[in-house]
């Protein structure tokens, strides 16, 4: 059975959500949302397949406010950003 994007994201959320956690950005205790470290629209623009867009290495948990604030931008200060960009570029 092929696992689609929504199923994989849902399974990841089930494992990592459900209780309030401390948001790594604002350090407040809040319910978390799933954020893509490298935004999906950028992965699509460079021509990566859907599997790369659903790479669990590219997921992080942020509170709703921080997730909305980050939006579709890349946070170059995030410790996973450069390794993920290298990984995805090398896969082209």
Annotated model-derived regions:
Residues 1-22, 50-53:
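Short, charged surface segments at domain edges that flank catalytic/cofactor-binding sites
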Residues 20-26, 63:
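Short cysteine-rich clusters marking metal-coordination/redox-active sites
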Residues 27-58:
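Histidine-centered nuclease catalytic patch
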Residues 56-81:
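Short Cys/His-centered divalent metal-binding micro-motifs
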